[in-house]
Structures are given as structure tokens and as C-alpha cells.
Amino acid sequence: MLGNFGIAIIKFIAAMITGSAAMQSEGIHSMVDTGNQVLLLFGLKQSRKPASEEFPFGHGKEIYFWSFNVAILIFAVGAGVSIYEGVHSLLHRNDISHGEVNYLVNYTVLAIAMVLEGIAWALALKAFRREKGDSGYFEAVHRGKDPTNFVVLFEDSAAMIGLFVAFIGIFLQQVTGNAVYDSIASIIIGLLLGATSAWLAYETKSLLIGESANRKVVQGIRKIVASVTQVNHVNEVLTVHMGPEYILVNLSVDFKDASKTTDIERTIATLDNRIKAAYPEVKRIFIEAEARLPRRTSHTDNEVVSES
């Protein structure tokens, strides 16, 4: 975080010296990254608050809320300012004296930033690969439940692409003597931030609303329930992520007609223990005892609830 802030300051100083709109946008980009990390750290801290009477399921969704804010506020603001800087520079490019542009300053700052951002990107990619397992990249992002993993990777990827765009824009300006390329680079960086913002908002929105657990987890829970002797049929397995490591489960189960109340109670305890042992991220389980029906038309059946 401090590294990004330091890079942002250096980029802004370079932009003041050289008059480069692309470098100005890169400074904004690094400042955006810094604010991004501050909000994500705050969200992680808030999400670890314990459950209370007011928030019985805890604060796990705080991380989803702040990740969504990162996408909407920071990236969107960064995109808007970068595009504005590029358009402004494009319209007033004759005000810049090309003889005063110190390209060595720009290239030095970009080289340092590329090395530092490259290291951060490699670490983020390594962590993301470890988390995604055998899933593809897009599938892992779409089905991922911890936004901090893919937000950081997206942020660092956008930063690397932005640096290359800035380099190309400044290089073309140096070769041609036309400042329009530097201005266009600034606009492209803004569009890159905007695209990143839209994609992150799309992915975090569904988490904020409430996504189900991954298909393998749901199928695994169904198999555990179906394997218990007293269970005649598993009607429904409903899950929702209350946080990256917090799954709430609601089961609709048809117990065998001959089952006694004590048998059902023991079965519920067994299910609770087995499911939580297999999937530690499952924190709360609610079980409804319902007869098997062709279509579920009512929620007025008797309910037996298991909580922990």
C-alpha cells in the first residue's frame, strides 16, 4: 500500500516535470490502487466482527460491500479523471512545449513502476492460481467467494497494462513529435480503469446479493444427507454465502414415516456434525422436515431447526 502511494507521488512529480498526460493518468491509477487497498483492508477488518443480537449471522458480507464500493467509486472516479486529463490534453496539446519534455524522466519512472508492479502482479497471480485449483480463470472469478483474491489480481493486471500503454504513448510522442499519442494513452488508461470497474462491479454484485455455495459443495451436502438411514428423500439443499468462509445451509428433508421424534433429533445432530466436518465453512444449518411432494406449494410445513 505504501509502495503504491510512493509510486503515485513519483508519477505525479514526473507528470509535472514532463507535462505528460499519460504519466498523470498513471499517477491517478496508482492513487486508485492505494485507496483500493485501504478499503479492502477496512472491509476485511469489519467482516471479522463477531455475530451479535443485531447481526446474528455476523458481518461477513462487509467485504462484499466494500469490494463493490472499490469497483464503483474508486475505479470509476479514476477512470473519469484519467479520461478527462486525456481529453483536456488532446484539446490543449499545443500548449505543451515538446522541447521541455524530459523523456528520460518518464522512462525511468515507468521502468521502476514496471518492476515493482510486476513483482506484485506475479505474487497476486500465484495466490489466485493456488485458490482457483482446477477451475479456469474466468470460472474461478465468476464462482469465487472471496473478492479480495480476484480484485487484487485485476488491479495489478490493469496496472501492468496501463504502464505499457503509457510507455507506448510517450514513445510515439517522442518519435513523431506529436503529443496526441500521449493524450490518447491517457484516454486508453481511463477506459481500462472503466472496464475494470464494470467487470468488478458485475462480479461483486452477485456476492453482495447472496450467491449459493459452489456446485461441488451443494452436491456433497446432498450426498451426506441422502446417506443417512432415517432420510427418505432430500427435497432441497439451499445455501448462501454470508462471507467468504461462512456458508448458511437450509435443508428440506423427508424423513421416513416410521421415524420417531427422538430418531429425527438424532438424525439432525448427525447431519449437523457430518456436514460441518466435511465442509468447515458451513457455520449454520437449518433443517425443515417436509413430506416429499411433486411440487412445493407451501411453506407451512412443520419445521425442525438445527443451529450452531
Q: Predicted segment positions?
A:
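Peripheral (non-transmembrane) domains and long loops of multi-pass membrane proteins
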Residues: 200-308
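Alpha-helical transmembrane cores and adjacent cytosolic helix/loop segments
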Residues: 1-212
